[in-house]
């Protein structure tokens, strides 16, 4: 049985789709004085991090877009709280980030820093390497 990959079958020069987003740090490009663009894996990682940190009704004209994990941060951390956070993160990423195929989500309590560490492992479409995004959720009053 022969092994074929996409580049040997597809004769086009560009077989992989690139993803571009604006850099939300609004850094200025030194030559064009425009906002710098982030590409490929960095764009998807930024999008995943933003979706996890977004609350419902936070984005104008999109009240349905959000994760809602900040509501669970004021509860006592139990194994069920970790499961609820994992489910909310998985739900928002499946619904609003089609570029990422989730492989695992790890939720760990950080009692010393009063936060919860979340690690999302996923594959970007058309790329073979796994990608990991780690963020810390903290209680903000």
Range-by-range predicted roles:
Residues 94-102:
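Short secondary-structure junctions
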Residues 1-87, 91, 103, 108-141:
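Immediate N-terminus of the mature polypeptide
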